[in-house]
Curated annotation (Swiss-Prot):
Organism: Shigella sonnei (strain Ss046)
Binding site for Fe cation: 91, 133, 137
Enzyme kind, highest EC tier: hydrolase
Protein name from the UniProt record: Peptide deformylase
Primary gene name: def
Taxonomy of the source species: Bacteria, Pseudomonadati, Pseudomonadota, Gammaproteobacteria, Enterobacterales
Catalytic site positions: 134
Pfam family of the protein (one): Pep_deformylase
């Protein structure tokens, strides 16, 4: 397994729409494993393949405190959503920035697991929010897209400054 490079805004590759996975095979499983390693290394709770420049419909999530409840979503589809909620969301592609984003409180999805087996899942709370956040990535949407143009500009400037400082270090 290896840690992959996470793309940061304003990288336009984050805006690409991911293509469906045609077959869950050893290559896809390796990508899933690398994505988990990357997510844990970056201290995230979710990661979409788009964020690591792989434009396939793959998401990994682990919202557990002990980091031992891996959830793999390949070709996820949103079946139902209900309620309204929101928390201050962060994103590995938008480092050190957070914003309140409106989300559905509960979701029902269908996806394939790491072995290519179909399943349905009903989620609420943090897991539901994380699923929606990561599914947005698969269509090229970022949490900051829900914000005003002024807030988006401020976030972009802060991230670009942070990346410049890290490049010098």
């Amino acid at each position: 397994m290896s840690v992959l490079q996470v793309l940061h805004i304003p990288d336009e590759r984050l805006r690409k729409v991911a293509k469906p996975v045609e077959e869950v095979n050893a290559e896809i499983q390796r990508i899933v494993d690398d994505m988990f390693e990357t997510m844990y290394a970056e201290e995230g709770i979710g990661l979409a393949a788009t964020q690591v420049d792989i434009h396939q419909r793959i998401i990994v999530i682990d919202v557990s405190e002990n980091r031992d409840e891996r959830l793999v979503l390949i070709n996820p589809e949103l079946l139902e959503k209900s309620g309204e909620t929101g928390i201050e969301e962060g994103c590995l592609s938008i480092p050190e920035q957070r914003a309140l984003v409106p989300r559905a409180e509960k979701v029902k999805i269908r996806a394939l697991d790491r072995d290519g087996k179909p399943f349905e899942l009903e989620a609420e709370g943090l897991l539901a929010i994380c699923i929606q956040h990561e599914m947005d990535h698969l269509v090229g949407k970022l949490f900051m897209d829900y914000l005003s143009p002024l807030k988006q500009q401020r976030i972009r400037q802060k991230v670009e400054k942070l990346d410049r400082l890290k490049a010098r270090a």
